[in-house]
């Protein structure tokens, strides 16, 4: 009981207009840490805390928040905590601290200074996970059309919303980026830290900005990699996705055409693309055998192709994947993991649709979508014609168009912020286009932008670059941003 009251006291300090005195006088609860690493040698520890479901009523219902910790490699020089987020929304981050030593492998000095903290954000993974009870094609993201075209996607979107309303209506009003940022500050407070450092990728940049907006005085060193655009509405972001992936599809086709001997897709880009499109069409008629009991449907292949178009250094995997399926052979052992990309999965004990359910609750909970179905139809037709790979999925309708709960608060804005953070982005990122980093840089004039002229989503530790790693490492160690923006050649 005492632990519950202490957490409430900390939560009250986060409510605008509430005096923080009670929280300052409270003693943070002692978390119970247990080993939870993926290997016996791992030093990763896990714990859980309770946070308010609704921060406007912090004495009301509480939910569980699962966190993890990789202790600082050099406790004597420990700087504080480095909270991490892999993106999403909907992504589990509990295991991410185990990967940070690889992401910052060239910067051991930075790694030595922090307890690296992971979290499953609210309603995700082991943090009071939500489910909509989705199955089959409902587990696909985005809303790919199939037989029945646009009308079928409308029906599917309505069915998804109906199921989410039946199973997760209790969570809908509280699944917001702002509340997740408040959870982040709860973690900081419970761990007894005066400030928070943060490493966030993709949607993690949105979380980082929300925290900066809500708690500017508690920001220490923030690294935001692959930045969403704070000036776009969610619908605008959907409509801007397809041209960037169309460009990546063209780059892949040209890549494959340069090595017809390995990939067998032809010696020119047009032929290479036609053969990939042909494979998807064949799978739409009859699933492609996979060597096990789970053949590849057209939806499976589209999903895998899309994920491998996120970064140009995945093109060789995509070429081999397509070549193997065209030959009706099982995937070789070294790329067998690609089969797992056909759909989002969940760890044991977590509902299989948790990623999709949480993604929708947060996306639809942050911002209202248009309700005009005919406008979605027009967008679908135009997107399908101009961007045939991803246009039909992203330009069409979203379940958010039928969401029963109107958003309670927007994502907090950093416009005019006096806080400086380190931004990282590639110029050709298809998922979080470079415009997002430039817009964030303008809104946060004290920040610095590190740019890499490649086509890659997620840079630090994902696209090897000594300049990026050195710049981020120096900032995490010293707290000093570069004097000016940094351009890092690949």
Residue ranges and their predicted role:
Residues 132-142, 212-275, 320-344:
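A catalytic-pocket lid/entrance helix-loop region that shapes and gates access to the active site
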Residues 163-170, 181-195:
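Conserved acidic catalytic loop of the alpha/beta-hydrolase fold
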Residues 273-418, 464:
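Alpha/beta-hydrolase fold active-site neighborhood
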Residues 417, 423-425:
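Short beta-strand/loop motif that positions the catalytic acidic residue
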Residues 453-460:
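Histidine-bearing beta->alpha loop at or near hydrolase active sites
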């Amino acid at each position: 009981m005492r632990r519950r009251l202490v957490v409430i006291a900390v939560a009250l300090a986060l409510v605008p207009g509430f005096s923080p005195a009670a929280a300052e006088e409270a003693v943070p609860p002692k978390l119970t840490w247990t080993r939870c690493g993926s290997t016996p040698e791992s030093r990763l520890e896990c714990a859980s805390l309770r946070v308010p479901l609704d921060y406007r009523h912090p004495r009301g219902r509480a939910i569980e928040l699962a966190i993890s910790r990789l202790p600082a490699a050099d406790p004597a020089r420990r700087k504080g905590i480095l909270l991490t987020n892999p993106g999403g929304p909907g992504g589990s981050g509990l295991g991410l601290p185990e990967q940070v030593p690889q992401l910052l492998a060239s910067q051991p000095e930075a790694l030595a200074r922090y307890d690296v903290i992971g979290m499953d954000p609210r309603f995700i993974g082991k943090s009071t996970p939500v489910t909509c009870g989705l199955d089959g094609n409902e587990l696909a993201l985005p809303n790919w059309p199939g037989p029945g075209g646009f009308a079928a996607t409308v029906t599917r979107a309505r069915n998804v919303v109906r199921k989410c309303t039946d199973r997760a209506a209790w969570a809908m009003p509280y699944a917001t980026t702002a509340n997740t940022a408040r959870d982040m500050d709860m973690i900081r407070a419970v761990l007894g830290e005066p400030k928070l450092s943060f490493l966030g990728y993709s949607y993690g940049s949105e979380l980082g900005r929300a925290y900066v907006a809500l708690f500017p005085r508690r920001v220490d060193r923030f690294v935001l990699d692959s930045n969403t655009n704070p000036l776009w509405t969610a619908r605008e972001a959907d409509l801007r996705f397809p041209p960037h992936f169309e460009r990546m599809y063209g780059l892949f086709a040209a890549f494959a055409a340069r090595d017809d001997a390995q990939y067998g897709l032809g010696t020119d880009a047009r032929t290479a693309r036609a053969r990939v499109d042909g494979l998807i069409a064949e799978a739409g008629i009859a699933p492609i055998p996979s060597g096990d009991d789970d053949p590849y449907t057209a939806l499976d292949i589209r999903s895998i192709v899309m994920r491998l178009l996120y970064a140009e250094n995945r093109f060789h995997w995509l070429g081999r994947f397509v070549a193997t399926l065209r030959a009706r052979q099982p995937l070789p052992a070294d790329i067998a993991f690609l089969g797992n990309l056909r759909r989002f999965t969940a760890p044991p004990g977590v509902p299989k649709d948790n990623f999709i359910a949480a993604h929708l609750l947060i996306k639809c909970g942050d911002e209202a979508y248009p309700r005009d179905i005919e406008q979605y139809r027009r967008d679908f037709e135009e997107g399908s014609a101009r961007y045939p790979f991803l246009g039909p999925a992203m330009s069409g309708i979203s379940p958010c168009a039928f969401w029963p709960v109107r958003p309670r608060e927007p994502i907090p804005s950093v416009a005019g912020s006096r806080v400086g953070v380190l931004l990282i982005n590639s110029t050709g990122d298809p998922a979080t286009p470079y415009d997002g980093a430039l817009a964030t840089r303008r809104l946060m004039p004290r920040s610095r932008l590190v740019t890499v002229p490649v086509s890659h989503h997620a840079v630090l530790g994902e696209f090897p670059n000594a300049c990026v790693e050195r710049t981020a490492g120096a900032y995490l160690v010293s707290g000093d941003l570069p004097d000016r923006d940094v351009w890092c050649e690949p």
